[in-house]
């Protein structure tokens, strides 16, 4: 229930966010008399020369993948030990059985690979399927007594079905995936309160309170059940909202990264599914299945030094032809996400990359009705916005994507400031034509930026290359 509510709410919020973004981008801010005469632009402070090192990036990528894979195995083995102790029976505990079951329980490792590598959901599901086939072979080989193939398949399928369905609901659609992980704690808490209330009411169905009888008599059975299910929301709405806002503030304070937040959320779902299936058999002892989740914050703290990048980080400016959503999103997944292991990424905000760049702080800024505060209205605000960029690495060693929200009347000032800050520029010119005046202006600015170490232009068959090269 909580997942379905999260998916529905995320669909609505994402659509409203996109609509609000478009409206603000097209709007011109009222003139500010205080900015009628532009102050002289102060020279940018000198920064260390950044080094572009593709080999270091590949090493960081493999180091990161090894870290999250080892973490998944650690969680899986811990879960298997606890399951053998408190769910299946302590007499079954042995080193071999714990390791085998731990490898099976570590199946979210394949989901983590998809998150790190930014695979499509189809490819991620394929990886999960291959992992489960390997685990099927392992369990058949390690089984003390021969088990029918259908029994083993049913057990493995039951282990992953609920978590995979949940992750598909909140992650398969880009529109939902952009917002759902940050609304999930709110709606899980509300849904849990509804389920608990209905269970308490069901336990007293033989002797219900008088007010319940009167409520059913006044509005009917199903409306009464609905009222009792939703009533706890009135009490928990503010605490749930406060918890979500606390998470947003923690993200802003760099307590965790966006990727580790998703990793923690998906592992919580996987462990929760195991706990729910064991709840009826062993009662509250099934909650011990959540204990392995604590390895995630511990690992995030312990791996900070090992995953930390070294040297001065280069800054990548991403420019693109707007309204080419699918293509630029794929480019973001394949290039920018890997670049984040080496340096910062800056860009002018747009709705085309909403599903890739939105973070908890963005979501709750919008829900508080303060999205317009993010937009820069004049050159002074551009400089202020750039000073507020978060250019330090997250605890997992990855750098964040910083966006400059611009009106139609301020994007050129923002572009000049971003180009001055950048070391490298990636400009996606697929679909570019002579009528794309904004891109032509950007090419003209790049032509005069002699400090850039590298400018990469991406073409395809639909690109008007002659116009682009002439402008450059």
Where are these regions (language model features)?
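Glycine-rich, charge-decorated loop segments at or immediately adjacent to ligand/cofactor-binding or catalytic sites
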Residues: 356-363, 458-472
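Cytoplasmic membrane-interface regions of multi-pass membrane proteins
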Residues: 16-56, 105-127, 161-184, 238-258
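Acidic/glycine-enriched connector segments
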Residues: 87, 91-98, 142-149, 365-422
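Membrane-helix interface and helix-disruption motif detector
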Residues: 1, 80-101, 116-122, 138-158, ...
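Transmembrane alpha-helical segments of multi-pass membrane proteins
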Residues: 56-73, 121-137, 178-195, 251-272
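Hydrophobic cores of alpha-helical transmembrane segments in multi-pass inner/ER membrane proteins
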Residues: 4-11, 100-111, 155-168, 227-241, ...
């Amino acid at each position: 229930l909580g997942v379905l509510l999260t998916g529905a709410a995320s669909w609505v919020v994402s659509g409203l966010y996109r609509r609000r973004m478009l409206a603000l981008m097209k709007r011109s801010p009222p003139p500010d008399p205080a900015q009628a005469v532009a102050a002289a632009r102060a020279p940018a402070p000198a920064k260390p020369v950044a080094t572009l090192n593709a080999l270091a990036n590949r090493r960081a990528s493999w180091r990161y993948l090894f870290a999250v894979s080892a973490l998944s195995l650690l969680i899986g083995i811990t879960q298997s030990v606890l399951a053998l102790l408190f769910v299946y029976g302590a007499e079954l505990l042995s080193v071999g059985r714990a390791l085998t079951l731990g490898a099976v329980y570590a199946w979210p490792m394949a989901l983590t690979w998809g998150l790190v590598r930014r695979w499509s959901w189809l490819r991620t599901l394929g990886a999960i399927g291959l992992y489960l086939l390997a685990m099927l072979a392992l369990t058949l080989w390690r089984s003390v007594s021969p088990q029918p193939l259908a029994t083993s398949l049913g057990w493995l399928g039951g282990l992953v079905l609920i978590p995979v369905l949940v992750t598909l609901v909140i992650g398969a659609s880009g529109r939902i995936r952009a917002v759902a992980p940050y609304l999930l704690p709110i709606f899980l808490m509300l849904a849990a309160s509804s389920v608990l209330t209905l269970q308490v009411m069901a336990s007293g169905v033989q002797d219900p309170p008088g007010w319940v009888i009167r409520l059913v008599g006044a509005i009917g059975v199903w409306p009464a059940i609905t009222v009792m299910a939703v009533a706890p929301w009135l009490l928990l709405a503010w605490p749930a909202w406060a918890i979500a806002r606390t998470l947003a503030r923690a993200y802003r304070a760099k307590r965790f990264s966006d990727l580790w937040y998703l990793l923690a959320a998906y592992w919580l779902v996987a462990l929760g599914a195991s706990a729910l299936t064991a709840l009826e058999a062993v009662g509250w002892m099934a909650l011990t299945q959540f204990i392995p989740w604590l390895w995630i914050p511990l690992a995030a703290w312990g791996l900070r030094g090992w995953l930390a990048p070294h040297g001065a980080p280069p800054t990548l400016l991403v420019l693109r032809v707007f309204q080419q959503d699918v293509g630029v999103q794929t480019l973001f997944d394949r290039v920018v996400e890997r670049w984040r292991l080496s340096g910062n990424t800056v860009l002018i905000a747009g709705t085309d990359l909403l599903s890739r760049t939105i973070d908890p702080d963005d979501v709750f800024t919008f829900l508080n009705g303060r999205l317009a505060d993010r937009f820069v209205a004049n050159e002074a605000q551009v400089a202020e916005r750039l000073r507020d960029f978060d250019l330090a690495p997250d605890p997992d060693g990855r750098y964040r994507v910083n966006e400059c929200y611009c009106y139609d009347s301020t994007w050129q000032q923002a572009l000049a400031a971003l180009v001055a800050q950048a070391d490298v520029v990636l400009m996606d010119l697929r679909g570019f034509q002579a009528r794309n005046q904004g891109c032509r202006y950007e090419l003209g600015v790049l032509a005069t930026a002699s400090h850039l170490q590298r400018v990469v232009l991406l073409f395809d068959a639909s690109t008007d290359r002659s116009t682009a090269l002439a402008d450059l």
